[in-house]
Amino acid sequence: MSAAPGRSQASSHRSPQGEGTPVNAHAVSRLRTARLAVSSKPYVARGSGLGRCPSCRLVASHCICALRPQVPTRAGVCLIMGDIEALKPSNTGWLIADVVADTWAFGWARTAVDPALLTLLADPQWQPYVVFPGDYVEPGRVLTALPPAEDQEAGQGGKRPLFILLDGTWSEARKMFRKSPYLDRLPVLSLHPEQVSNYRLRRSTHEHHFCTSEVAALCFELAGEQRAADTLAAWLDVFTDHYLSIRQQLPLDWQSDAHQRLQALTGPAP
C-alpha cells in the first residue's frame, strides 16, 4: 500500500457510515484509508466513539486543523510504516505529513515491496538516507552529519535529501531495517541528539528513543532547515496538548506555551 505526497485540508465530508473523510488527504491519511479498506474488522482505538475529525484525528472541540502549519522544504520524508501504525490516533508520522508537503507513506510487508517505493528511491532528484542507529550497521554506511545546504545543492548533482523513517515500535523498526534488502545499498543517517525525548503519548523504557516526528525534526535540523525543524516540534507539542486534554478530560489551554511557539512560527491563527 502507498500514498503519494499531498496536502490535506481542514474540510471534510461525511461518508454513508457517518464518519468524516478528509478532502485532499495527505500521504499518511491515504495510507490509513487504504489499510482500512482491506481490514477484516474495524480498528477500534481508545476514544474511537467520541467522533474524531478525519483530518487531525481529534474530537471537534479540540480540532487543530485551523492551526495546521505548512513549511516549504528542500528535504523530503519517506515513511515506511508498520502494519497498523497509520491507524493509530497517536501516530506522529501523520504530523510530519501535515507540515511537509513532500512526504510519502508506504505500508511495510516482509514478503513484498510497493513498486512506487522503489521508484521513489531511484528518483534522481533525491538522495535517500535511512535514519537508523549506526550501531546496527557496518561503519562504512554510517553518516552522523549532512553537508551544509549550499554544499548539498552544489554536490551530488543537486540532489535533495530524502529521509527514510521506519515508523513503528522499536521491535518493528528493527525488523523493517533487517528484512528490507532494498534499503541495504543506502547510507544510514545515525542521529546523536543531546536532548532526550519529550514525547508523552506512548511510553518507552528508553529516554533516547524518539517518536517519529521528533526524528524528522532532528533530520531537518541537520539539513539546515531550522524553520521546518522548529515547526515540526511545535506542531507535535500542540497536538500532544490537545490529545492529552481529551484523554485526561482536562480543560484545554489555547494560550499554552506550545500554542504560542507555533503561532510565533506561523503567524496569527485565522
Predicted segment positions?
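Short Cys/His-rich local motifs and their 1-3 flanking residues in nucleic-acid-associated proteins
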Residues: 58-61, 65
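Short metal-coordination and nucleic-acid-contact micro-motifs, chiefly zinc-binding Cys/His arrays
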Residues: 49, 59, 73
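Short microdomains enriched in Cys/His and/or Lys/Arg
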Residues: 66-93
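C-terminal folded domains that constitute the principal catalytic or ligand-binding module
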Residues: 162, 171-270
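S-adenosyl-L-methionine/SAH cofactor-binding core of RNA-modifying enzymes
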Residues: 101-174
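Short Cys/His-rich Zn2+-coordinating modules
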Residues: 30-46
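Short cysteine-rich clusters marking metal-coordination/redox-active sites
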Residues: 53-56
